């Protein structure tokens, strides 16, 4: 027997139609919208045998079919409009506390005995009255003609259709009839004159906000009053010859009342009077009233959201369709596929085929056919939803989707994100098949047998198919974006990038990015007993295992213990020698901490007098750092007792987290600071590197992984100091030429330090006054250059001379300069030495500063920040490095790939026109139990993703080169309420005006293929030159030969060891003239961007209610739909 799962008492928000019979007598067991998983059902019902007549039902339904309206309601003259008014007058309250004004669907209940189809309790309870009417037989069972639920009035419970065979036959019969269009029982009567007059009056009242009327009111009484006033009480003849008098405008509102108060009166008449007064009053009042009235009229012209019929637990489908119906560009793009005859070209090229060598594939030109069945059904459904009206039944689209994705059949609950992905992928595959037909026809594959095709032909088909798949197909233009994955090897520092497209981004719901498990660092008092102590069962005496888990310090050769922490009840105390050594270690740790703090504050290096003393102190500090970084405080003893280990305490015990200059675009190469820093050993840079926080300009403690200003983010911005010391993995990139020359120019007393810094990549050390060190201390590159100038002047003024590594004395010019003058000189020198280079590392920088997360923040921005953070790939996640493989194994093609530690980072390389964010709320918890994360995640109305986009995004044609923001506006939210095994999907959508054909937002749609992002450096340079020429032509400026970027060099910069091309003063002057008027204009344009106006609606299947924007921003979001507006 299979053990039944106990229903969760919290999971009640399942999806059924809004007209269910279980609205009555729920006895506290759930809400009216429960489904099979949570609605109380009975295992057996004794009324099934007497209350079901399948044969009679089949005969009746064959002639009448399923009805659309209740026959009793039609006889009594109760229409759907009166029902909706009655429902609204009952005082139902929806989200946000607003009264519910939704549309009732026409769900009917079919009596399984006589076949009558009547309305349920949600409307006029005719089905219940039919049961309560005395009959000679039982009429206790009724079936919902939309959701196919069966209800027993006698048991007051929901009945499972699988209990009896006759019940199952009835359900199958009704399901077949439900695919046909419903019929009406009563033919509409001939329209009367009064009915026509009421329709005309309603239409004219609806048009009054658009066309101001000058003939008075449509009310008969008001018309007669106007005639009497005009005729002075005259008779009929006078009323015929005289026109209707125009009513006097109302008095202007007092100064205490706002204009919005005067405009929010009775709909129709009040607006007509306001518009009339706007045309008769002064010019100032005209402009003000018309300006305020225009957006209100535009919003009122927007169609109301159309509800969707629940086809049986299809709330997941309905919620997604409501958001897709409000998606811009989608319907227009899909309609372009309806007409056949579109031409395309596949480039072909030279490719290597197995056992055939290199072959040349010709270019293919072809003509595409029209769209497929699923694409046509989707376009039809979207058009119906955008047109507005009553409840729409998307049966055709859902059936088409179920044919391609059978998992959605059966009426079970499914995931809304899964449905969205399957729907978009199915539409994409249909479009791709149009290309595949042309490819097969060109290769002569159409008339051949599949099994008889050669391997060469299969390879050709695959190559052409991949070229077609790399194209941005028509349905993907709306949602498709690109992510770039950048891998940096920690051994050879080789950087590689790979682009991959996405239709939506799945973000984990977490405050911080999950890091590898770290060992808890014990306090110094417990470090002596940090080895696991246990009591042997035989002797009862405690035994001590002094093997530590840091990987380098082994006190004894005993087996490693499972426990990493000491027991508090350890009875064995430390010896005197151990206490003495512990005190000595504490003193060394305090001295090292003081020296680190002192060296980080004294950036000008005035206290570096004697090289021998400094090297000695550095050795001691490194040893103390190693003792602290080992994790257990026992490093010194380990250094004395390790067998067969020789290590240099200066180089290999400490891993620096220096920042390289290779990951920026326009780097400032400063040569003036080098002479003044030669007498400062480069190993002192490691003292300032492992700081966990820094103080920004506002005095806030920030982690070193986040950016402070407009400078680009560094590759190792996570800076896992604890993991570095534990694993011995260096996170610093390879030293550049500047760092190497600084290390070799150190004094003779520190030759061993400089040599060790050059020998190993993990021990690469840099100058404390180098740009990366100053940036690590919390300064921007501009501020770092100013401090370098000031420190150089101060040091030179104190010593009156500095000796180079070669012993040459250099003359010193020491004019007094203010910080502003020093900054201006640094900028002038930077402009003359700016050079544009291209490298993979440009993808590791962002076009805007990194987002600063607050403590405990859980928002979409924090989720994106964690998604784009640098990951350390180590242990089981090591990455195969081609450079290391070639260096170690040579050019042997059969050599095994060498796996190394690496860092990985994901950034957006091409932003989509419509961004879909999926919050991963359903996760696998402890003990392999699925759970739902109900933690609130805040999301803004305007989202800026510039902090998560790579700097090469500026090369795209739909992004301005000086753009610092990429703004998206929210227009759709899919919310899930309930638990893991039972819930309900609803949607919040914003109805907005359609995008005009000439709107600039059309350029946000991508064109081309993925290969455009994977161009070689030469192709990229050519592309940049073309872009630079185009912009220079618009600005009437000359073209710079090196195709330099006109943006500020403090944002994204990079260094290069290649020859540098200095810019002429004339070019610099032209660049400044081009920058000055445009930079404020660009910022002002970004600040004035607003979300498109519109109305927010809450939609739950067929239930539609207008809500405020604040209500939509407080939902428990599962899917977020954003449209790009800037």
Swiss-Prot record:
The lineage of its organism: Eukaryota, Metazoa, Ecdysozoa, Arthropoda, Hexapoda. Belongs to the peptidase C19 family. Its EC number is 3.4.19.12. GO terms for biological process: protein deubiquitination; proteolysis; regulation of protein stability. The gene is Usp16-45. Residues 1-15, 705-718, 807-816 have a biased composition (Basic and acidic residues). Keywords: Hydrolase, Metal-binding, Phosphoprotein, Protease, Zinc, Zinc-finger. The keyword Zinc applies. GO terms for molecular function: cysteine-type deubiquitinase activity; zinc ion binding. Transmembrane segments: none annotated. Residues 1-44, 215-264, 513-547, 570-762, 795-833, 1037-1089 are annotated as: Disordered. Zn(2+) 1 binds at residues 45, 47, 152, 155. Involved in the regulation of DNA damage repair. It comes from Drosophila melanogaster. Residues 32-44, 674-701 have a biased composition (Polar residues). It catalyses: Thiol-dependent hydrolysis of ester, thioester, amide, peptide and isopeptide bonds formed by the C-terminal Gly of ubiquitin (a 76-residue protein attached to proteins as an intracellular targeting signal). Disruption phenotype: RNAi-mediated knockdown in third instar larvae results in a significant reduction in survival in response to UV radiation. Residues 215-229, 254-264, 524-539, 599-614, 646-657, 730-762, 821-830, 1046-1086 have a biased composition (Low complexity). Zn(2+) 2 binds at residues 70, 73, 119, 126. The active site is at 315 (nucleophile), 984 (proton acceptor). Pfam families: UCH, zf-UBP. Zn(2+) 3 binds at residues 111, 114, 130, 139. A zinc finger (UBP-type) spans 43-181. GO terms for cellular component: cytosol; nucleus. SUPFAM superfamilies: Cysteine proteinases (SSF54001), RING/U-box (SSF57850). This is Ubiquitin carboxyl-terminal hydrolase 16/45. Residues 586-598 have a biased composition (Basic residues).
């Amino acid at each position: 027997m299979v053990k039944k799962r106990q229903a969760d008492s919290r999971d009640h928000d399942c999806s059924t139609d809004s007209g269910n019979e279980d609205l009555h007598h729920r006895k506290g067991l759930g809400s009216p919208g429960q489904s099979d998983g949570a609605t109380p059902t009975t295992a057996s019902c004794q009324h099934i045998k007497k209350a079901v007549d399948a044969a009679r039902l089949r005969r009746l339904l064959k002639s009448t079919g399923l009805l659309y309206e209740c026959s009793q309601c039609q006889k009594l003259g109760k229409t759907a409009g009166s029902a909706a008014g009655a429902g609204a007058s009952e005082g139902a309250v929806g989200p946000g506390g607003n009264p519910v004004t939704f549309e009732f669907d026409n769900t009917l209940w079919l009596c399984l005995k006589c076949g009558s189809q009547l309305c349920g309790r949600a409307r006029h309870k005719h089905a219940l009255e039919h049961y309560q009417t005395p009959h000679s037989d039982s009429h206790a069972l009724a079936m919902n003609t939309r959701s196919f639920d069966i209800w027993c009035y006698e048991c007051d419970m929901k009945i499972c259709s699988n209990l009896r065979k006759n019940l199952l036959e009835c359900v199958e019969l009704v399901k077949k009839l439900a695919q046909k269009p419903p019929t009406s029982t009563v033919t509409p009567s001939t329209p009367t004159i009064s009915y026509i007059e009421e329709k005309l009056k309603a239409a004219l009242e609806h048009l009054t906000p658009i066309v101001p009327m000058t003939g008075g009111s449509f009310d008969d009484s008001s018309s007669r009053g106007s005639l009497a006033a005009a005729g002075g009480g005259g008779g009929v003849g006078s009323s015929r010859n005289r026109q209707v008098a125009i009513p006097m405008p109302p008095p202007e509102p007092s100064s205490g009342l706002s204009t919005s108060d005067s405009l929010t009166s009775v709909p129709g008449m009040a607006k007509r009077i306001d518009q009339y007064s706007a045309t008769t009053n002064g010019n100032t009042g005209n402009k003000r009233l018309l300006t305020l009235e225009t957006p209100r009229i535009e919003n009122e012209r927007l169609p109301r959201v159309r509800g969707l019929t629940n086809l049986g637990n299809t709330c997941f489908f309905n919620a997604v369709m409501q958001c897709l119906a409000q998606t811009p560009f989608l319907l227009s793009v899909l309609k372009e596929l309806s007409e056949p005859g579109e031409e395309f070209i596949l480039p072909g090229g030279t490719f290597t085929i197995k056992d055939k060598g290199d072959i040349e594939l010709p270019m293919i030109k072809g003509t595409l056919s029209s769209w497929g069945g699923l694409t046509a059904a989707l376009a039809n459904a979207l058009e119906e939803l955008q047109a507005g009206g009553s409840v729409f039944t998307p049966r055709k689209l859902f059936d088409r989707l179920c044919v391609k994705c059978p998992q959605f059949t059966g009426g079970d609950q499914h995931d809304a994100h899964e449905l969205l992905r399957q729907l978009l992928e199915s539409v994409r595959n249909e479009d791709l098949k149009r290309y595949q037909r042309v490819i097969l026809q060109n290769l002569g594959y159409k008339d051949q047998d599949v099994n008889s095709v050669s391997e060469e032909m299969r390879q050709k088909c695959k190559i052409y198919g991949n070229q077609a798949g790399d194209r941005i197909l028509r349905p993907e233009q709306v949602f498709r974006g690109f992510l770039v994955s950048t891998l940096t090897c920690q051994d050879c520092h080789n950087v590689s990038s790979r682009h991959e497209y996405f239709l939506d981004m799945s973000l984990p719901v977490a405050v911080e990015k999950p890091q590898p498990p770290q060992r808890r660092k014990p306090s110094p008092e417990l470090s002596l007993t940090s080895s696991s102590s246990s009591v042997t069962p035989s002797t009862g005496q405690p035994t001590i295992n002094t093997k530590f888990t840091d990987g380098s310090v082994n006190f004894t050769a005993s087996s490693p213990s499972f426990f990493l922490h000491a027991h508090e009840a350890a009875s064995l105390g430390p010896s005197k020698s151990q206490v003495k050594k512990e005190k000595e270690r504490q003193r060394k740790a305090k001295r090292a901490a003081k020296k680190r703090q002192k060296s980080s504050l004294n950036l000008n290096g005035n206290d570096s007098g004697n090289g021998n003393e400094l090297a000695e102190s550095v050795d001691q500090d490194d040893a103390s750092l190693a003792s602290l970084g080992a994790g257990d405080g026992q490093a010194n003893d380990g250094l004395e007792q390790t067998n067969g280990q020789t290590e240099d305490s200066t180089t290999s015990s400490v891993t620096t987290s220096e920042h390289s200059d290779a990951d920026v675009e326009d780097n400032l190469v400063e040569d003036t600071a080098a002479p003044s820093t030669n007498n400062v050993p480069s190993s002192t840079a490691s003292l300032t590197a492992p700081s966990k926080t820094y103080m920004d300009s506002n005095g806030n403690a920030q982690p070193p992984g986040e950016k402070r200003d407009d400078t680009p983010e560094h590759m190792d911005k996570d800076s896992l100091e604890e993991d570095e010391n534990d694993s011995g993995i260096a996170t610093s990139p390879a030293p550049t030429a500047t760092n190497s020359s600084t290390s070799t120019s150190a004094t003779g007393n520190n030759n061993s330090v400089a040599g060790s810094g050059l020998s190993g990549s993990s021990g690469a050390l840099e100058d404390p006054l180098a740009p990366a060190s100053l940036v690590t201390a919390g300064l921007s590159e501009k501020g770092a250059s100013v401090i370098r100038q000031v420190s150089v002047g101060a040091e030179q003024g104190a010593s009156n001379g500095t000796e180079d590594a070669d012993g040459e004395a250099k003359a010193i010019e020491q004019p007094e300069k203010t910080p502003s003058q020093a900054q201006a000189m640094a900028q002038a020198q930077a402009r003359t030495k700016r050079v544009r280079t291209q490298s993979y590392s440009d993808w590791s920088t962002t076009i805007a500063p990194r987002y600063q997360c607050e403590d405990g923040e859980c928002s979409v921005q924090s989720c994106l920040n964690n998604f784009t953070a640098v990951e350390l790939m180590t242990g089981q996640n090591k990455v195969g490095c081609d450079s290391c493989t070639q260096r170690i194994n040579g050019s042997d093609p059969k050599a095994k790939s060498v796996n190394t530690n690496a860092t990985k980072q994901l950034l957006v390389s091409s932003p989509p026109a419509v961004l879909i964010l999926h919050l991963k709320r359903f996760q696998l918890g402890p003990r392999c139990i699925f759970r739902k994360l109900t933690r609130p995640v805040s999301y803004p109305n305007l989202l800026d993703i510039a902090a998560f986009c790579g700097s090469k995004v500026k090369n795209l044609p739909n992004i301005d080169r000086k753009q610092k923001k990429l703004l998206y506006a929210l227009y759709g939210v899919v919310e899930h309420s309930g638990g893991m095994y039972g819930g309900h999907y609803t949607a919040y959508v914003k109805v907005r005006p359609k995008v005009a054909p000439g709107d600039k937002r059309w350029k946000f749609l991508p064109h081309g293929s993925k290969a455009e992002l994977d161009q070689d450096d030469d192709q990229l340079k050519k592309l940049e030159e073309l872009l630079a020429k185009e912009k220079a032509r618009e600005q009437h400026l000359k073209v710079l030969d090196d195709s330099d970027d006109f943006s500020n060099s403090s944002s994204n910069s990079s260094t290069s060891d290649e020859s540098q091309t200095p810019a002429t003063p004339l070019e610099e002057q032209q660049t400044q003239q081009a920058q000055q008027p445009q930079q404020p204009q660009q910022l002002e344009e970004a600040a004035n961007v607003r979300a498109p106006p519109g109305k927010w609606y809450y939609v739950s299947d067929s239930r539609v209610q207008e809500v405020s924007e604040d209500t939509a921003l407080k939902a428990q979001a599962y899917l977020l739909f954003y449209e790009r507006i800037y």
